[in-house]
Amino acid sequence: MTMVPATRADADAVAALHLASWRATYRGIFSDAFLDGPEALANRRALWDGRLASDFPARRHVLLARDDDGALVGFACVLPDQEPDAGVLLDNLHVHPARKGQGLGRQLLQAARAWAGAQEPASPLVLYVFERNVSAVRFYDRMGGTVVARRVSGNPVAGGAVELRYAWPPAHRPAVP
């Protein structure tokens, strides 16, 4: 497996993997009608077309995990300026559903933490996860994250689901176990 920065040419593949991850993980949080309808893919394509455009703010990092054949198997997106009062935001960490449990999430999180620490050494790394996404909650607990806040999601398709904000303090950014 290799880790490489994303380019504009990766937008469609990242959008497709993002949606595959949502479909495997967010049933019961997002409606099936949304997840299975054309709006979800259009939503993800618009997001990644924008994030990977050349005029997107330079302070962002989208890291791709590719298998030995070059297929996209995971990605992480760090947005340092998205929530400056909370810390450096890890906005996305997704692994292809068929590749979960192989250490890819751990490697992506470790790489995201290293990049965040280099950009903003005095800021914590933070992320939001749906409380009902039990496998992700367990993963972040194992990775040493601490729940520091709860909120009702502002995502209109989340139906008022609760999100947990996890944080890793800046002084405590050792390699992920």
Predicted regions and their residues:
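Acetyl-CoA-dependent GNAT
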Residues: 5-8, 16-100, 106-119, 150-153, ...
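Hydrophobic beta-strand residues of extracellular immunoglobulin-like
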Residues: 61-64, 127, 164
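Acidic/polar helix N-cap motif
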Residues: 7-10, 133
